[in-house]
């Protein structure tokens, strides 16, 4: 039965002989104070210590604590025990009951925390627990403070605001001047990663993320962790329940400084040093006592043979027997195991103590596929919506047939994948692929130049988006194809894109893809492309506004070794944008204020060029023009003259908070007065979005549709008014988004939802945002956490590299064209011939309920989406033919 005690309803402070802590039940048990009694300074930063939570914050479904109760228990005779209990309400946590116990042993300078989560609800929950500590190790947080931990890449001493998969189970903040440290130690079987907040001199916080668990009704999850405080160290190189340690190498000595949180007399340390080449140095044993407030120095004779990373391994013995460390937090061996670096090290990778950092890793999937080739090497076709993982294994079905068929409209690009994997025991090298012309037998052809072959590079994801899903390598970067190997333990995709120019005659086109490899006879894959007898709109029906910071893109281009001028790079972006039917704001935004604004507009028109002027679906007018009414009028007149006013807008504000709404309304009114033909708009989201009735355009976050405001948005869309929406780091699954580790269907279904809801525009904040210091080819994670938000195009020394997601987005824009042409033909046929035999079939095809029943419950099966697209495409052909008779 649950322990009973004295209920606390106000701030409470408890202390041992070495530390004190203060908390309040209304603050969810967060420690507002934590101090060494020998020092008056509070180690808790502004955000407090031991803030606990689950998952990722949502502005739509906030997590709440219910029935909060704090008690002082007297079940342990020699120490105070605080127990906090509460019930949870929110996404993935409803029905959870939380119990947290904090114990202060009298002769220790740390607090032991036992955190237990019980599912008292009726549904299983995906529980992603975390603990956050905002630390102020000295009198004030400043630039000298050190936040340290051990990642898979070794010691981290200068973190930013980012995640680190944990190779060891501790994190520490130290003031090297005052030599005070506050550190936390977690169960290494539970700790997945550490998120650090050291983006400026005023914050030093870390957040421990535990391995998420599926918690069934009636089941519990529990962990134990410790928060300790010590003095005497200028940094921390290792920490455990009982102590923190600093390692120094100088003058032929390796010195271990140990600051303890407990009292352990008559200890003997048996230590060794391990080099990367597995050379081992056994160090002479040292004897000492440890107790809180006392700094122990153990000096060993050892000089490094060279610069590099070394491991320090040690066992403590007491009375000749091992003195096991970290009994509470569950160290795998009860000893000391850490890394230190001498000079410059090229290899600092550190194997984790446990498999926890890899607990969410992708698992091989068995793919039932008909093989194109089934010999030493297996080759098969994959949908462009199936993100092929390197560990995926084909299970051949039936007899191999070297035939691939696709269908596409005139003016459309259609992709598919050729997947390669050697049979067990085989290795195939120097695989080369070429494509020939596709001919229709009547003198018409799709030339080989319209068939693009690209390799697919993978980007590693160590933290899943929103802590939901799996980790591992995800296919995304598309590069010009070079020869490649096929191995028995890895599947390799090749991305094939066929484009039918708008003037391509309808019909069936046939040709071959040739595959050559060392030690194998040449292979031919027969490719059939059916060109449907209708043409996509030259200017897409779906309006898009995707952000691009050309200055940042140019700097990134230079960083990867590019030599293009800014104008040449802009042309590369324009080419891929037009090929993918997307409008990039960085290319189509009108000039900023200028003394000769007419001249600036003329230069802008020349830079953009006639193709983009004709095909772009949006043109942004800079908000800063509002201070220059004459320039606004000139821009407005220019838009009218070029017949582009229906595509013009001005972004007045981005997701303004409620206190700013009055000012934003004034700005909207000013724009409508100055330039009635330029639509002012404001992006908005959350449970209280900014939705003024007289605003020309609404730009809402996608998840607003699932709130009470969704009814008003849908009403406005049904009236044919201008409604756009956007995604960014939100929404999470099960919604659609453009994130790296979302499935292809989850990337593409957004366009079908856009059509079904009557929304006519999609906005996206950036296509090539890279955080400072980040290598986009290795890591696309932000602190949300999400992977790939704001990056759809990769930098290249030759210009721009498309992503697999960029291709899927193009297909989604084309889907919207299909649906637009389908609806137009159906409406015209209904008016011309209400009893036409095609109309019942068209009505069935128009029913998208199975494909998109709502914003979250759509099937993830690529076949269902692709079959619906083909069904609609064929009906467009038939209905247009019927209308032409």
Residue ranges and their predicted role:
Residues 5-19, 26, 41-44, 87-92, ...:
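Beta-strand-rich recognition/accessory modules
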Residues 9-89, 203-204, 337, 444-445:
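Acidic-aromatic substrate-binding/catalytic surfaces of carbohydrate-active enzymes
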Residues 3-5, 9-14, 19, 42-51, ...:
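Polysaccharide-binding surfaces and accessory modules of carbohydrate-active proteins
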Residues 222-224, 231, 622-624, 630, ...:
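Catalytic domains of carbohydrate-active enzymes that cleave complex glycans
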Residues 54-112, 136-138, 197-207, 213, ...:
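Extended, loop-rich substrate-binding clefts of extracytoplasmic carbohydrate-active enzymes
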Residues 69-74, 277, 349-400, 413, ...:
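Surface-exposed binding patches on compact interaction domains or structured appendages
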Residues 542-774:
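Catalytic-core regions of glycoside hydrolase
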Residues 86-140, 497-523:
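Acidic, contiguous internal or C-terminal segments within carbohydrate-active enzymes
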């Amino acid at each position: 039965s649950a322990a009973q005690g004295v209920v606390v309803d106000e701030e409470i402070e408890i202390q041992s002989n070495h530390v004190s802590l203060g908390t309040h039940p209304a603050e969810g048990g967060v420690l507002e104070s934590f101090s060494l009694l020998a020092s008056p300074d509070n180690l808790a930063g502004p955000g407090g210590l031991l803030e606990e939570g689950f998952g990722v914050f949502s502005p739509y479904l906030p997590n709440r604590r219910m029935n909060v109760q704090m008690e002082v228990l007297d079940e342990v005779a020699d120490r105070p025990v605080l127990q906090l209990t509460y019930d949870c309400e929110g996404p993935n946590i409803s029905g959870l009951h939380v119990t947290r116990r904090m114990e202060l042993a009298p002769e220790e300078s740390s607090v032991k925390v036992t955190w237990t989560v019980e599912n008292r609800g009726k549904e299983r929950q995906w529980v992603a627990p975390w603990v956050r500590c905002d630390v102020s190790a000295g009198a004030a947080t400043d630039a000298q403070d050190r936040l340290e931990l051990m990642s898979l890449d070794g010691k981290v001493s200068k973190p930013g605001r980012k995640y680190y998969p944990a190779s060891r189970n501790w994190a520490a903040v130290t003031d090297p001047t005052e030599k005070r440290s506050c550190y936390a130690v977690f169960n290494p079987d539970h700790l997945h990663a550490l998120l650090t907040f050291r983006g400026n001199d005023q914050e030093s916080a870390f957040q421990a993320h535990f391995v998420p668990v599926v918690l069934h009704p009636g089941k519990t999850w529990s962990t134990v962790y410790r928060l300790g405080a010590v003095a005497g160290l200028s940094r921390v190189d290792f920490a455990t329940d009982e102590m923190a340690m600093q390692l120094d190498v100088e003058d032929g000595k390796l010195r271990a400084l140990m600051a303890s949180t407990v009292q352990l007399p008559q200890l003997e340390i048996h230590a060794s040093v391990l080099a990367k080449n597995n050379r081992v140095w056994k160090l002479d044993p040292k004897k000492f006592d440890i107790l809180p407030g006392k700094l122990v120095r153990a000096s060993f004779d050892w000089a490094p043979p060279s610069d590099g990373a070394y491991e320090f391994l040690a066992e403590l013995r007491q009375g000749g027997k091992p003195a096991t460390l970290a009994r509470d937090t569950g160290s795998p061996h009860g000893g000391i195991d850490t890394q230190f670096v001498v000079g410059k090290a090229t290899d600092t990778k550190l194997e984790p103590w446990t498999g926890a950092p890899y607990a969410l890793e992708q698992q091989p999937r068995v793919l039932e596929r008909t093989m194109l080739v089934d010999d030493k090497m297996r080759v098969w076709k994959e949908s462009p919506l199936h993100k092929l993982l390197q560990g995926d294994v084909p299970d051949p079905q039936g007899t191999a047939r070297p035939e691939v068929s696709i269908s596409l409209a005139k003016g459309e690009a259609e992709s598919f994948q050729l997947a390669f994997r050697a049979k067990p025991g085989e290795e195939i090298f120097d695989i080369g692929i070429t494509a020939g012309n596709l001919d229709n037998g009547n003198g018409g052809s799709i030339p080989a130049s319209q068939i693009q072959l690209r390799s697919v590079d993978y980007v590693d994801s160590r933290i899943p988006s929103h802590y939901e899903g799996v980790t591992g390598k995800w296919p995304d970067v598309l590069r010009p194809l070079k020869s490649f190997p096929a191995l028995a333990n890895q599947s390799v995709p090749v991305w094939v894109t066929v484009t039918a120019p708008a003037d391509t005659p309808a019909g069936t086109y046939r040709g071959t893809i040739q595959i050559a490899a060392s030690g194998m006879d040449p292979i031919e894959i027969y490719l059939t492309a059916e060109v449907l007898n209708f043409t996509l709109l030259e200017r897409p029906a779906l309006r898009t506004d995707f952000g691009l910071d050309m200055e940042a893109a140019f700097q990134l281009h230079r960083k990867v070794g590019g030599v293009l001028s800014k104008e040449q790079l802009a042309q590369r972006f324009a080419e891929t944008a037009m090929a993918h039917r997307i409008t990039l704001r960085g290319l189509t935004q009108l000039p900023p204020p200028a003394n000769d604004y007419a001249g600036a507009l003329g230069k802008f028109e020349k830079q953009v060029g006639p193709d983009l002027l004709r095909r772009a679906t949006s043109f942004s007018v800079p908000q800063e023009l509002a201070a220059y009414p004459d320039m606004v009028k000139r821009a407005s007149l220019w838009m009218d003259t070029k017949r582009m006013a229906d595509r013009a807008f001005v972004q007045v504000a981005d997701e303004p908070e409620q206190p700013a709404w009055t000012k934003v309304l004034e700005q909207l009114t000013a724009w409508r007065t100055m330039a009635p033909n330029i639509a002012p708009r404001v992006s908005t989201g959350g449970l209280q979005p900014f939705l003024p009735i007289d605003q020309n355009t609404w730009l809402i976050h996608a998840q607003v549709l699932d709130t009470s405001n969704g009814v008003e948005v849908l009403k406005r869309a049904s009236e044919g008014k201008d409604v756009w929406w956007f995604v960014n780091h939100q929404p999470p699954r099960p919604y659609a988004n453009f994130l790296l580790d979302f499935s292809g269907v989850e990337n593409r279904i957004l366009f079908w939802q856009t059509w079904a809801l009557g929304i006519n525009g999609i906005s996206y904040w950036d296509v090539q945002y890279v955080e400072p210091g980040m290598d986009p080819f290795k890591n696309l994670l932000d602190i949300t956490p999400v992977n790939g938000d704001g990056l759809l195009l990769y930098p290249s020394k030759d210009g721009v590299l498309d992503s697999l997601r960029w291709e899927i987005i193009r297909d989604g824009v084309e889907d919207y064209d299909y649906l637009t042409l389908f609806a137009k033909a159906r409406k015209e046929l209904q008016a011309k011939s209400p009893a036409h035999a095609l109309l019942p079939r068209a009505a069935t095809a128009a029913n998208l309920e199975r494909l998109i029943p709502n914003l979250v419950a759509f099937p993830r099966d690529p076949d269902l989406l692709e079959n619906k697209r083909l069904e609609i495409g064929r009906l467009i052909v038939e209905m247009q033919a019927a209308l032409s008779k």
